[in-house]
């Protein structure tokens, strides 16, 4: 079953994030799942773990998007680091380790901020544009 899930995720990586609109949808999906985690106190349990695992897949999809744009090694690095943090968070949430889960969530947020600061512009209407 695990092989099927990872195979399905690998197929999705090639399907999603082909253009800016698809990428923005991915980021909204990531934001929704991050919101589930942000509201959880403590940051443990099956809902937090499931959201973190979904976020890890989104980071893979994000990396595919940035690889196609070229000259975005920093964004691909943040995608890798974000995925790693999301998987750490999922593991800690399953184990009930609130301290590790909180630390991993903070690390994950740092990767989001790093990429947003470099690759996102806020428009006058409050929406964002990918640089």
Question: What is the predicted role of each segment?
Answer:
Residues 17-51:
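Immediate post-signal-peptide N-terminus of mature secreted/exported proteins
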Residues 60-78:
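Short, solvent-exposed, charged loop/turn and helix-capping segments
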Residues 38-49, 84-108:
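Amphipathic, charged alpha-helical scaffolds that flank and support histidine-based chemistry
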Residues 108-119:
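The canonical Cys-X-X-Cys-His
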Residues 96, 118-125:
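Inter-heme linker and motif-flanking segments adjacent to c-type heme-binding CXXCH motifs
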Residues 126-131:
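Short cysteine/histidine-rich metal-coordination sites, predominantly Zn2+-binding motifs
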Residues 8-17:
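Hydrophobic h-region of N-terminal signal peptides that target proteins for export
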Residues 1-4:
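Positively charged n-region of N-terminal signal peptides that target proteins for export
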């Amino acid at each position: 079953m695990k092989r099927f899930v990872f195979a399905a995720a690998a197929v999705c990586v090639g399907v999603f994030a082909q253009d800016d609109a698809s990428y923005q949808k991915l980021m909204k999906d990531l934001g929704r799942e991050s919101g589930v985690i942000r509201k959880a106190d403590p940051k443990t349990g099956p809902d937090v773990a499931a959201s973190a695992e979904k976020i890890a897949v989104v980071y893979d999809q994000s990396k595919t998007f940035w690889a196609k744009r070229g000259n975005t090694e920093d964004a691909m690095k943040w995608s890798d680091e974000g995925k790693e943090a999301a998987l750490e968070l999922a593991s800690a949430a399953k184990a009930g380790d609130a301290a590790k889960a909180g630390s991993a969530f903070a690390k994950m947020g740092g990767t989001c901020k790093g990429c947003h600061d470099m690759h996102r512009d806020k428009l006058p209407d409050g929406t964002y544009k990918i640089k």
